[in-house]
Each structure stands twice: as C-alpha cells, then as structure tokens.
C-alpha cells in the first residue's frame, strides 16, 4: 500500500449428435460390471482396460506407441461371456496384448519407386518417393510414420499429365483398380481384410478435371485423428464453406471458385446444432460437447458472419430448442445462452439413440411450407456436423435422411451445376466404439477436403475446437484467451504484465499492468517516482523470465500524488495512470496478447456491435448504471487467479465512495469528492456479494469486464481503503468498508488516444 493510504502496490447448418460411449475409467481390480460378465481373465498384457456403458463393454488401453491386439473393445454378451478375441482373419486368440504400432506399407506405387521397402514400418521410420523420367511428383516426397499409425504429409503421386483428370494416386495402404483418367472414367479403391475404408471407394473423372468424392484411406481400429489434424482439416473445409459463389455473382453454373470467409449480408447460411442426449453419452461428455459447440459458435462469429442457427437435442425423440426461423437465431450470444441452459437430464426418461429422427428434425427446418420454395432458397448453404459412434439403435438408417436432404436441396441432380457446395456433412466419430463404416457413409465426400474424423475421446475433441479458435490469424485480436485445461496462467491472462521497480537502498516495488499494444503496457502512475530510471524498471510478459527493455514511462499530465497536501490530503490518486513504452516490439502468441481498450474498433468487434457504434454506446454497454460484474487478476503463491467483483455504478455507488473516509489519512476529509473524483470506479464491500479485495502488488493491473467471451479493460487498479493482505496473506474476514478504487478508462481517453495514436487501435 502507499505511504499512509492503501494504494494496491502490492484478467452453415451444423448438426451435433454425440454418441461417445459414456466412458467411465475404473481400476480393473476394483471394478465389477453392472451386467452379467465376469472380469476374470479379461486383462491385457502390457496394458489395462476400462469399462464402458455401465459395464456392458470394455476398452483396452495401451501405452503411447502401442495398440491393443487383436481388438480394442469387447462387449458383454447375453450369455454372460465377453465377445471372443479374434484377429482380422478371424483366428481366435486366448489373451489380449499390447503390440507396437506400425504404419502400413504401400501396396502399389505407380510410375516411380519408394525406399526403403519393408513389410511394415515402425513409428519414426521414414519413406521416400521419386518418379520415373517424364513424370512429375505431387504430394510429399518424404513421409514419416507417426505414433497414431498414420503417415505424415500427403499422398505421393507420379503423373505425366496425359489424362483429362490428374492421376488420383494410391494412398498408402489402399489398392486401386483403374488406370484410365479420361472424362467419366472411374477408379475404385479397396482395403485389406480387417481395415475400414474412409472416404470414397469409387471416384469418377468429372468435367473441369476434378475427381468426384474424396481421397480414401484404410483405417485400423486403433487409428485416430490427432486434434491438430482434425482442427486443420476441419477448419480448412469450414472456411471454404462459410461463403461460396452464389448464383448471381457473375459466374457460370457449375463454375468452381475459391470461397471466402466473409459472408455477403445478402447471402444465407443455416447452422443446425444437434446433440445426442441418449444413455450412451454420459453427463460429462454431454457437457464437453456443449463446450465444443460454444467454441464453434465463437469461431464462426469471429469471422464476422451471422448464420442462422438451429439447436436440437435428441435421444429416443428429438427436441428442438432453437429454430432457424426464429428472429434471434442469427444472434450468436442468444444461441449460446440457449445452448448453455440445456441439461443432460432433459432426455432421461426416453434415452434410446434415434439419429434418424434427429436428422428428420433438421430436414423439417430446411423444408418450406406447402412445398413452395421461398425466394433465394437456392443460395442458402447448409452444413451438417454429426458427432457419433455410428451405432444408432432405433429408428432406422439415418443415411436415408441425408439422401432426402440432398433431394430437397436439388444437389447432385444437374451434372452441369451439381450444387455440392450447398451441403456439407461433417461426421466426428468419438470414442472407442466407433463404427467407421457407418460414419463414413454419412459424411460428405469432396475433392481435397476431409469431412469424416475419428477422435479418441471427448478430451481430444475439446482440443480440436480450442485449436480451431486459437489460430495464428487471431493473435492480434484483443481480449482473447486460451481457456484450455492445459493452458498456463498466461494462456488465460495473456495481457498480464508484471512490473518491478528496483530502488537502491529502498528495496523494490511490485505492480501489475496490461499489454494494450505491441509497444505499450498500461499501468498505474503511482508505481513510479520521478527519480526512477528506465533501467531500474523491469517488465515481464507471458510468464517469461527475461525482462523487457524500457524506452520511457509516460504519466498522465494531471497526475500529482502530492497535489492536495496543503489541503490535508496526504496522497491524491486522481489520474493515476501511466504507459510504459517498450524499446522492442512484442511478438504476440498464445501467452502474449493485448487486452481490449474502450472506444476502439477492436472493442466494437469484440462486443459484436455495429461498425457505427459510438464511444458513448460502448460505455452504455460496458458500464451501465447498475452493479456490473467485473474481475481483476491477482498473484497468489506464484499463480495468477481471477477475482470476481462488482463495480458499484448504480444505487450502491454513493455508499461505496463514502467508505473512502475509512482510509488512513482520509478520516478528516469533509467532502469525499475531494479524494474520490469522477475518474474513479469503486468495488468491494459485501453487497450484492462479498467482493474480494486487491492486494499490495495488484496496483496497475486491469479491472476487466468479460463479455461475449472477450475481455475489455475498463479500469486501472489504483488504491484501497483497507490493507487486507498483511503478512503476504489475503485475510478471509474483512470489514464491509473494505473498498477498492480504480481509474475509469473512459475518463482518460483523450490521453490514451494521444499516446497510442500510432498503435493502430482505431480509437473512435
């Protein structure tokens, strides 16, 4: 705290049907299935197992780099015995074991050679391809066997360009029948016994030189897509879908153009989110799925597009929560709110798995009354995202509904204008019980795009959507964080800066600050004295141990801590703000990002307000005349933690400010406005809730409003009435008059705008 006072020197249509298996991990020695199968003799050599579906199935688990042989899962049969251990060629095995993962070998490679040749390849082994004279290599010349049993890179293809279509290649592990690539010629692909084909089994050479469908691959049961692979492939395809060429943009029918991220306001997209709430899911997986969808909505919104959403949950029967026809269905915040309010128990009484009914609910929202298409129906794009293990247990085959949707949207009927761009079906297989044949049948198959994915578990799926959001293009966006379970303190508070001022013979002073641009950190002026030299000021960001070089500290010209000493006020904190200018430009990353400042274009976008929004309108949005939920970031036991407080900006504002009289040195102040000027925001006290207080070392840190998943700084921590952190420990019991005061950034905007005018923040 300060000298006598307490300045605190001291944060498309999409479908989601999740059928992930409801996994419960249990030590096998203690577990007992709720079914009738004994656990005796089911253990696996070199690994362990866990029970699924309340003991009706089990999954074998092996260390990284190994896979369960001969099967990954077993089911409890009605006879009271576990399903037999059988190899891919149907031979019975007595005991399961963990075997080293190998990558498949190329069965065929046309018009070239590969080296080394081997019946199988171990993890980290490399293979190289080269072409015969007259042929050109496409794809990856060198590939590495990865820990998930897949080869890195892209399919190597040797082509001489003689065909109407280019050579479609032979993905490693597949066999191809057909070597003519003329218009309307077809090729077919096959997998070895025991492997499942993903992608298109048959591909046809089409007008324009492209192949129908998507590149196939052969999958073993232990193979999974990594979160990074899924995020890259899905996001690549998704951004292709977010806008396409419509029928009125001057391009001829069937003409393929690169689709853009920015959606034409006159265009149309519907996004249907459909979650499976059946018994096989489990509450934790259902909650995880909702988190994924929230992140997906955020991702789409970050592109500045406003599709219409539909929201459906289902088990035996579907339940429609949001219809695309509703007025608010394009409001991402409103849709997110509806999504967060859904409970897993909503389908508890009828908990079958009727994927077909869920898709029919989507079909009903796509269709139009009296079978009369509305104007512009053929410019609406549709995307379906289905998360499932493919094991629907009632209602019939859901693929028939996909066919009906294609028919409704007039897709694939006109060879010259097949309209394939207007429907994308993404299928995520989640968990060990995935039926790869079924999920592949449901997914779209498009050239150079991937629409079917298999992820290991819900944890991996959440990784996918976090990676989608946190791509490099968004690093400069203000107020964004990486709210991931694996994230560090600085992933979650990437703007937070630690400041230390070393004063010879006087020790050192600690403060906080916030990164507001690539060259500036915003903090409190009282953290420094006029005698402090730049070399004595240490600033660190992103949790890095190295200190940043300081060019200059800029004080607000109206700040003067001794300005009212003659009036008997020992310390005066009006205009208590300063900017630290760094010598070198910060490099933004996941742990170093700027916070949003009021009255900037970045905050307008963060709040999803119209581009014409004024500074006053931002103020009304962020600081309405009421109690405002906010937060600050404090360091406790070397960890950054968020503390939730309420800014008293309504009927409690006066009493909050009057409690300043309890601060040391202010007890004789007759008019509290002498020390609490209009530049201050007040937090603390016990109403409407007991607010935590700032500590010595928190000074200069940001007071933050968290809205629409973005963080906007509205204040700078300045001073407090009570020192609640004596002896380096935060007191649990504090008086009701323990208040904290923060400089309101809306009140110092002219100064901020002047000093940050070259930082490309777009002040309004």
Curated annotation (Swiss-Prot):
Binding positions for Mg(2+) per the UniProt entry: 278, 280, 353
Sushi domain ranges (all copies): 35-100, 101-160, 163-220
Annotated Gene3D superfamilies: 2.40.10.120, Complement Module, domain 1 (2.10.70.10), von Willebrand factor, type A domain (3.40.50.410)
Span of the signal peptide: 1-25
Residues that bind Mn(2+): 278, 280, 353
Disulfide bonds: 37-76, 62-98, 103-145, 131-158, 165-205, 191-218, 478-596, 511-527, 599-615, 656-682, 695-725
Record PTM: Cleaved by CFD following activation of the alternative complement system, generating Ba and Bb chains. Cleavage and activation takes place when CFB is already associated with complement C3b.
Mutagenesis or variant effect for residue 286 to L: In AHUS4; gain-of-function mutation that results in enhanced formation of the C3bBb
Site feature (Cleavage) residues: 259-260
Family matches, as SUPFAM superfamilies: Complement control module/SCR domain, Trypsin-like serine proteases, vWA-like
Entry similarity comment: Belongs to the peptidase S1 family.
Self-association and partners: Monomer. Interacts with complement C3b; this interaction is dependent on the presence of Mg(2+).
The protein, known as: Complement factor B
Naturally occurring in which organism (per UniProt): Homo sapiens
Name of the gene: CFB
